[in-house]
């Protein structure tokens, strides 16, 4: 999650998000790729689901991108299992009903939606862990996402993970992920982005994988914002 520092405020050990930031975060700019002029959307509501939702940073960026395009948005389904994350998420989005373990919910029970957001567990691909990939139960959660995309056939998705996913198993893991998504008739693009390039006071690289049924997202053109240490101290 590459959330801008000016869009968060502290709450105990964790963070609560707020929508006052005027700087476009990575999530916002990625989400804007969905909304091309040629695409048709019901302005009454762009529906999306938020899986492995964490504190809600990806949702925040998506909702702000909708606002930029003059679109209303509605989160119709949220899934998260960690109690502390659920507590903070509800502080950010008070009207949200949080569903538990997504592996225990049949795709047919998920409401119809236009876009899927998912920061699926990164430990199996992180350089800080054992990097067991799909052999790790958490790594296999990608296939849960795949099952949902196959069953619900939304217009697009935005997936986030650690940058180590790109090099895991000499790049073969990412190739499998891209291939499986393309098999579902999505046009897919990916890129590694650094939080420091979006006005955030830390170097934090993440891989973003974005897919759309109607066009190939452009993940190479971003408005990058760098801030000095002095600006952050102020």
Feature roles, as predicted:
Residues 121:
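Short glycine-/small-residue-rich Rossmann-like dinucleotide-binding loops
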Residues 105-115, 125-234:
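Class I S-adenosyl-L-methionine
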Residues 79:
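The conserved SAM/SAH-binding core of class I Rossmann-like methyltransferase domains
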Residues 94-101:
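Conserved SAM-binding strand-loop segment of SAM-dependent methyltransferases
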Residues 82:
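Conserved SAM/SAH-binding beta-strand->alpha-helix loop
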Residues 46, 76, 97, 115, ...:
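Hydrophobic "anchor" residues on beta-strands that sit immediately upstream
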Residues 1-75, 180-184, 206-234:
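S-adenosyl-L-methionine-dependent DNA methyltransferase catalytic core
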Residues 89-90:
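Conserved SAM-binding loop
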